[in-house]
Amino acid sequence: MITVYSNGTAMIQAYADYLNTNPYLSQWFFVDGPLITKPDRQNYAVSAGTAAAPLLCVRVAPFSTVLFGDPDAAAELLDFLLAEDYEISRFLTSETVGDAAVRYLWERHGLRYQEALGMDFMEAREITEPSCDAVSAPESEDLPEIIECLENFILDCGLEDSVDEASQRETLSDFRILRADGKIASMAKLARRDAPFDTITNVYTRPEYRGHGYARKVVNNLKNEIVSAGKIASLTVDKKNPVSNRLYESLGFQRLFAQGEYRRV
């Protein structure tokens, strides 16, 4: 059964227990859901399937639609979204749901989607090496350089996102940076969650400083901060990037599952 919600919070409340069965996969529902207050074809919260086996989706423009739940409900959900002209040019979900959706979109609707970015979700629960004193939080005057690094990070990852300068200014203290030659050589950001885990995001090293262990020090410092606070450190890494995978594994991160962003081609 299809249900269109008047706001994202209503969906979260209706399926809170279900979403909490996998807080890693469902985290974007708690981030994006409250932002949906006036739903339309670009910003929406919709569910399909049954109460026991639903497939939930939320979208906040300009970001990807996020899917979570039972792949057997993919046909019902996708038929509705397409028939009602909802924006679904790209979506983020587990590989299980993603593969089912891609297959159905092609076989039933002749629409070709492909996994544009495959990611491994990893977590770490222990401190494995000491923090580096050279890693620090940025100052307000570092914001332009951080914005520059974020824009380069988006290009490197092949994402279609844009940088919201106001948002980054508000969360500037959550970044950690490591300098070399008077500029930011490497950085990462702490995304705080109302959950047992926090996430390390936006890990970026300037090309001329790669291969020298800068990212390792920044990520390790953030991991240590998270673990010391009694939480689990989590991150996602491109499955096609073996260098980063080995780096995170050497810091004690373990792979839990795979997810991907799928785009229409």
Q: What is each of the regions a protein language model found here?
A:
Residues 1-27, 124-160:
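Short amphipathic alpha-helix that is part of the acyltransferase structural core
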Residues 3-4, 23, 30-84, 90, ...:
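Conserved donor-binding loop and adjoining core beta-sheet/short helix segment
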Residues 72-79, 205, 211-227, 245-250:
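Conserved acetyl-CoA-binding loop-helix of GNAT-fold acetyltransferases
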Residues 92-98, 235-247, 261-265:
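Conserved beta-strand-loop-alpha-helix junction that forms the acyl-donor binding cleft
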Residues 187, 256-258:
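Residue-level detector of high-confidence beta-strand sites
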